[in-house]
């Protein structure tokens, strides 16, 4: 179990998370609007945009 936690922690250390640019954010807005939601969070994780709608 401890080994597993360490592994997860190591992987997390390599993850690059940045805030979305305007373009990326509007892409999220588009995605969320399709499901009739608003953007809750927009992050770029290892160069791929992740959207959270609510």
UniProtKB/Swiss-Prot annotation:
Keywords: Disulfide bond, Ion channel impairing toxin, Neurotoxin, Secreted, Toxin. This is Putative neurotoxin-I. Expressed by the venom gland. The keyword Methyltransferase does not apply. It is found in: Secreted. One of its GO terms (molecular function) is toxin activity. GO terms for cellular component: extracellular region. The keyword Secreted applies. Disulfide bonds join 20-42, 28-51, 32-53.
């Amino acid at each position: 179990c401890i080994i597993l936690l360490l592994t997860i922690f190591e992987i997390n250390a390599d993850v690059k998370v940045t805030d979305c640019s305007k373009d990326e954010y509007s892409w999220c807005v588009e995605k969320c609007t399709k499901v009739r939601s608003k953007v809750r969070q927009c992050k770029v994780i290892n160069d791929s945009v992740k959207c959270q709608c609510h």
